[in-house]
């Protein structure tokens, strides 16, 4: 018979394991491997750091889906629609602390400090994002970018920060991490409202249903202050496909997608420059190139 402790662990982790079996892009692992071109962290430490980052990322997705009232994740039902909200919250929080336990095995005096700081950043960013959405407050582009750096940058910063503790490479990688954090999130925002891959994979334009202020919608709202169409559509939390299609067309008409593509191209170019300044990194360049295909190819 299954031991009681093992059985309890299995039950606790089931929602988390459900999420793990969904197909993912493993971008964070690839990113850590790419940064190791410079940092040359011993393999045993690197594996622990990658595991910790993946654990925190996936646990935060479980919570995100609850906070966003999402229906689908990677084209599958969200964990809380199967296991219920209380179990999923508990499972995700449990995994945060399993991550902390793993960080302790790195056996470095600064590791826990770094872990704590980056998780605080992550929650501060997420809190702002939710506040704007739920109070119908449209942030400026600058406010939005600052929030993204806390939210997306939090986990990027954790992986690379932990790696640097075990590396002789002491260049300041924060500017590059910030560029990549913005690039990833704005690309994600664009994909959610514009890409075929996303509309088949996520419920169509889920960011509109969630009422989320994302990079293209923020541009549309601030560039056409005389119109409140986008705010009103976001406020409705609509699942109506026709309204969502109308909104996407409106974003196209007011130049928000073109502006988003332009911003992504600028961030991409900036990333290449920063990578070069740090001494070059073929695998990181390849990763950025691969992610850029989405917003370059579909507009040829």
Curated annotation (Swiss-Prot):
Matches recorded under PANTHER family: GERANYLGERANYL PYROPHOSPHATE SYNTHASE
Binding site residues for isopentenyl diphosphate: 25, 28, 57, 74
Residues that bind dimethylallyl diphosphate: 73, 151-152, 185, 202, 212
Post-translational modification N-acetylmethionine, affected residues: 1
Record has Lipid metabolism as a keyword: yes
GO MF terms, alphabetically ordered: (2E,6E)-farnesyl diphosphate synthase activity; dimethylallyltranstransferase activity; geranylgeranyl diphosphate synthase activity; identical protein binding; metal ion binding
Leading EC class: transferase
Protein name: Geranylgeranyl pyrophosphate synthase
Taxonomy of the source species: Eukaryota, Metazoa, Chordata, Craniata, Vertebrata
Binding site for Mg(2+) 2: 64, 68
Assembly, per entry: Homohexamer; trimer of homodimers.
Organism per entry: Mus musculus (Mouse)
Record field: catalytic activity: isopentenyl diphosphate + dimethylallyl diphosphate = (2E)-geranyl diphosphate + diphosphate; isopentenyl diphosphate + (2E)-geranyl diphosphate = (2E,6E)-farnesyl diphosphate + diphosphate; isopentenyl diphosphate + (2E,6E)-farnesyl diphosphate = (2E,6E,10E)-geranylgeranyl diphosphate + diphosphate
């Amino acid at each position: 018979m299954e031991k009681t402790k093992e059985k309890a662990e299995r039950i606790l982790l089931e929602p988390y394991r459900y999420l793990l079996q969904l197909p993912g892009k493993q971008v964070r692992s690839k990113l850590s491997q790419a940064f190791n071109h410079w940092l040359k962290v011993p393999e045993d430490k690197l594996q622990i750091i990658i595991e910790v980052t993946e654990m925190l990322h996936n646990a935060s997705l479980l919570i995100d889906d609850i906070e966003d009232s999402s229906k689908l994740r990677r084209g599958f039902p969200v964990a809380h629609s199967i296991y219920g909200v209380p179990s999923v919250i508990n499972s995700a929080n449990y995994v945060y602390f399993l991550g902390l336990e793993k960080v302790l095995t790195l056996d470095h005096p600064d590791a826990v400090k770094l872990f704590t700081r980056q998780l605080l950043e992550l929650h501060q960013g997420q809190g702002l994002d939710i506040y704007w959405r739920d109070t119908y407050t449209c942030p400026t582009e600058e406010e939005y970018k600052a929030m993204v750096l806390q939210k997306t940058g939090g986990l990027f910063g954790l992986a690379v920060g932990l790696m640097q503790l075990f590396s002789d490479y002491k260049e300041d990688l924060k500017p590059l991490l910030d560029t990549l954090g913005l690039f990833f999130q704005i690309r994600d925002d664009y994909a959610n409202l514009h890409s075929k891959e996303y509309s088949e994979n996520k419920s169509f334009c889920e960011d509109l249903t969630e009422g989320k202020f994302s990079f293209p919608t923020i541009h549309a709202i601030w560039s056409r202050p005389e119109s409140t169409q986008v705010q009103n559509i976001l406020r409705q939390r609509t699942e109506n496909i026709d309204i969502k299609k109308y909104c996407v067309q409106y974003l196209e008409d007011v130049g928000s997608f073109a502006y988003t593509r332009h911003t992504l191209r600028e961030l991409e170019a900036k990333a290449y420059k920063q990578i070069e300044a740090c001494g070059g990194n073929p695998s990181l360049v390849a990763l950025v190139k691969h992610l850029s295909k989405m917003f370059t190819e579909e507009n040829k």
